[in-house]
């Protein structure tokens, strides 16, 4: 008899609507993405960047540790020796479509030249735009230098 009354008064539907109405008047937890952004963790791994020293010289010493450790083989480096005996890169390419953003290149770098920055909005319509050359990586480093420095400082105790 009770089951008959429950089905007659559409008990399940009333319970479902009550639950819906209860959540309808609660505060919203979503954000309006393009206009509001959630905070990013200091350990977030985003778009790659090559850093420079304070005097403007690029940090990369062409040791190729990042190329060797990259599990996706997304990094290609070519280097040449300078007159003073040091080496500098002539080509430093990262294929962002191959990259798995593991951060091993950043961990392997002895001079903190290659880092993964806070930027996560670098979508593109073409594959060639996602193959970053040395100039693009250095531009990213110049653009995000303050954020990268503070990120590395906050992450220092975990390295």
From Swiss-Prot:
List of residues binding [4Fe-4S] cluster 1: 60, 63, 66, 109
Residues reported in the UniProt entry to bind [4Fe-4S] cluster 2: 70, 99, 102, 105
The keyword Cell membrane is annotated on this UniProt entry: yes
Coiled-coil boundaries: none
EC numbers for this chain: 7.1.1.-
Membrane-protein topology: Peripheral membrane protein
GO biological processes: aerobic respiration
Family annotation (Gene3D superfamilies): 3.30.70.3270
Cofactor binding note from Swiss-Prot or TrEMBL: Binds 2 [4Fe-4S] clusters per subunit.
Cofactor: [4Fe-4S] cluster
Phosphoprotein is among the record's keywords: no
Keywords from the named record: 4Fe-4S, Cell inner membrane, Cell membrane, Iron, Iron-sulfur, Membrane, Metal-binding, NAD, Quinone, Repeat, Translocase, Ubiquinone
Record-level Gene Ontology MF annotations: 4 iron, 4 sulfur cluster binding; iron ion binding; NADH:ubiquinone reductase (non-electrogenic) activity; quinone binding
4Fe-4S ferredoxin-type domain span: 51-80, 90-119
Catalytic activity: a quinone + NADH + 5 H(+)(in) = a quinol + NAD(+) + 4 H(+)(out)
Superkingdom in the source lineage: Bacteria
GO CC annotations on file: plasma membrane
Location relative to the cell: Cell inner membrane
Function statement: NDH-1 shuttles electrons from NADH, via FMN and iron-sulfur (Fe-S) centers, to quinones in the respiratory chain. The immediate electron acceptor for the enzyme in this species is believed to be ubiquinone. Couples the redox reaction to proton translocation (for every two electrons transferred, four hydrogen ions are translocated across the cytoplasmic membrane), and thus conserves the redox energy in a proton gradient.
Family: Belongs to the complex I 23 kDa subunit family.
Complex formation: NDH-1 is composed of 14 different subunits. Subunits NuoA, H, J, K, L, M, N constitute the membrane sector of the complex.
Stored HAMAP family: NDH1_NuoI (MF_01351)
NCBIfam families, sorted: NuoI, PRK05888.1-4, PRK05888.1-5
Protein name (database record): NADH-quinone oxidoreductase subunit I
Species per Swiss-Prot/TrEMBL record: Rickettsia canadensis (strain McKiel)
Gene (UniProt): nuoI
